[in-house]
Amino acid sequence: MIMFCVQCEQTIRTPAGNGCSYAQGMCGKTAETSDLQDLLIAALQGLSAWAVKAREYGIINHDVDSFAPRAFFSTLTNVNFDSPRIVGYAREAIALREALKAQCLAVDANARVDNPMADLQLVSDDLGELQRQAAEFTPNKDKAAIGENILGLRLLCLYGLKGAAAYMEHAHVLGQYDNDIYAQYHKIMAWLGTWPADMNALLECSMEIGQMNFKVMSILDAGETGKYGHPTPTQVNVKATAGKCILISGHDLKDLYNLLEQTEGTGVNVYTHGEMLPAHGYPELRKFKHLVGNYGSGWQNQQVEFARFPGPIVMTSNCIIDPTVGAYDDRIWTRSIVGWPGVRHLDGEDFSAVIAQAQQMAGFPYSEIPHLITVGFGRQTLLGAADTLIDLVSREKLRHIFLLGGCDGARGERHYFTDFATSVPDDCLILTLACGKYRFNKLEFGDIEGLPRLVDAGQCNDAYSAIILAVTLAEKLGCGVNDLPLSLVLSWFEQKAIVILLTLLSLGVKNIVTGPTAPGFLTPDLLAVLNEKFGLRSITTVEEDMKQLLSA
């Protein structure tokens, strides 16, 4: 059987249409896994439909609330490639739905939900049979009837909500819960399960998702800073230190903290990778002296870099790609919603097996000459620099700020972001976040009167800090955010980036430049609407974009 998936930047693009629709997607996801993810999403939409009904009776099931976004997160690009685990999530969704339904019926014997997914049942235990059932829920099944524009808007909402669900899970792990957010999530997820076809309603939904995600990022920020302190500027070594080692990748700071606690005194050093790099800025994480540095570059290079790492690797969230290519599948471990067939999975927070493996391996034989980069410009630090920024602007020492961030990826056109960073004039500042920073974060940019010209604000969700800084600067200057000498040049790859974009648009931020390509699910008509309404456009050349942004 074949699949249909168009959710990431590397999706197949042909004159006949966009989307991976063969036996395997560009990410390595098989048609079986992709189709079963469609089935899981349908089950989750049914679960959310009953969660909405339950709230009408004052019933809030926290097991449902914690499970639903987490399971949805498992369908995000480069998270879970393990078909049996995807089916397991679908079964759990249905079991939770039935329990919630029973709670509703206990209050009202006539309780009903008008949603096509509300009573979904899996037809078999056989993966092949389930894959055939999943064909009923492939996202483009009614494309001929509704047209590409409606399909594109549906997918914009679905993928945006998926990105928000990922951030909800990150926040939940840190003990953060907001009933209003979960109620809104279930309402939107259930509505998407009705296969809506009204263009205006879908556009409004996309903005609602963006507004909801701003609240999600707020509680995630509260969770991270509440547990680990506010990030402050910190130098991080990106070269090897002699000794046994473990590499941890993803976004989950709690997993990193637990690993650091459990490795303390064992002689095993811990390195961050990818989106874990900003962890070094948090006081409660950097206090561990055996958190010795950051290893590697963008996630897309992991098959080469992980193969060279002389210790085990722990993946806490996206992005994982085929570990068999580099023959390190026997020493990579998955956590939480991450999965790869045949790779060992850690069900709980006990890393003893990983530590034991690290102690049996050689580790790095010698320490390399250190190369230090600076991270840790979190929200509090950024706000503390607001007056300095305003002073530099008023004295014409600082001409412009570029927010240059987002996802990294393998496409060659992404070298644009390196070229853009190195072309930024000396009297301008670069604010960066997310893994797109690996395109330029080891280069030297100097400073403006002691203020670094390259300011690393953190992970992708730390777009929240950048937004708060922009709002604060606008308030202090008595203008709107769009009137600031600030331009956003964003790279995208997956669904977290989509919801960050929706968040910015929902807040009224205009004239954002994105690349390296437009999302494959957005038609020329939809891109024209976004351009007309928000000034959103794609990158062209560094020279033309720089000229236009500096003259705006």
Curated annotation (Swiss-Prot):
Annotated GO biological process: response to hydrogen peroxide
Q: Which cofactor does it need?
A: [2Fe-2S] cluster; hybrid [4Fe-2O-2S] cluster
Function description: Catalyzes the reduction of hydroxylamine to form NH(3) and H(2)O.
Q: Which reaction does it catalyse?
A: A + NH4(+) + H2O = hydroxylamine + AH2 + H(+)
Q: Know the name of this protein?
A: Hydroxylamine reductase
Taxon lineage: Bacteria, Pseudomonadati, Pseudomonadota, Gammaproteobacteria, Enterobacterales
Which cellular component terms (GO) are annotated to the entry? cytoplasm
Q: Which parts of the sequence bind hybrid [4Fe-2O-2S] cluster?
A: 251, 275, 319, 407, 435, 460, 494, 496
PANTHER family in alphabetical order: HYDROXYLAMINE REDUCTASE (PTHR30109:SF0)
Please list the residues that bind [2Fe-2S] cluster. Answer: 5, 8, 20, 27
Q: Which Pfam family is one of this chain's hits?
A: Prismane
Tell me which residues bear Cysteine persulfide.
Answer: 407
Show the NCBIfam families listed in the entry.
hybrid_clust (TIGR01703), PRK05290.1 (NF003658)
Q: What species was this sequence derived from?
A: Escherichia coli O1:K1 / APEC
Q: What is the cofactor note?
A: Binds 1 [2Fe-2S] cluster. Binds 1 hybrid [4Fe-2O-2S] cluster.
Q: Where in the cell is it found?
A: Cytoplasm
The first-level EC class reads oxidoreductase
- Which keywords, in A-to-Z order, does the entry hold? 2Fe-2S, Cytoplasm, Iron, Iron-sulfur, Metal-binding, Oxidoreductase
Give EC number(s), comma-separated: 1.7.99.1
